[in-house]
Amino acid sequence: MSTRRLTCAAPHGTLTASMTQAVESIDTQEALETLMGPEGPAAIIDFWADWCGPCKMMAPQYEAVATALAGQPIKFYKLDTERHPELARAFNIRSLPTLLLVHRGEIKDALIGAQAEATIRKKAEWLLNKATGRGLWTRLFG
């Protein structure tokens, strides 16, 4: 059995980590299967680890976006790759932090490395527009 080591990729910064009610934890295979099912919601999954400095640095930005978009039809999740390596392996996660943008069981985009709040928000709004049919065509022509 081979072991693969995850790497951290991000700029230097302050290390902090916290959880808010706007961000839910994925702790089981069943929860992940529901999320990735054909009726799964628009969601962003943050793959992280406690030892990963860039993950801790990005956590407040991720949570700020989740809080700002609370009540919208988009969900925000965190998956601890140290506690649940088998769930991370299912997505072939190789670097931390990694954000996967998913909708109806499909990965729509991925962001690798620590991201600024503005970048996370822009991608979250893009996914939200895609999931609710508020894309460019709809905005232009109704």
Briefly describe each language-model feature range.
Residues T7, T14-L15:
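Short, positively charged and aromatic/hydrophobic N-terminal segments
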Residues E24-A42, P85:
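A short beta-strand-turn-helix
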Residues G40, W48-W51, S95:
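Short pre-active-site segment immediately N-terminal to redox-active cysteine/selenocysteine motifs
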Residues C52-C55, L99:
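The canonical Cys-X-X-Cys-His
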Residues P54-A70:
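Typically the conserved alpha-helix immediately C-terminal to a functionally engaged Cys/Sec
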Residues I74-F76:
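Hydrophobic/aromatic anchor residues within beta-strands of the central parallel beta-sheet
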Residues L79-A88:
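Structural microenvironment flanking redox-active thiols in thiol-disulfide oxidoreductases
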Residues S95-G135:
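Non-catalytic, surface beta->alpha helical segment in thiol-disulfide oxidoreductase systems
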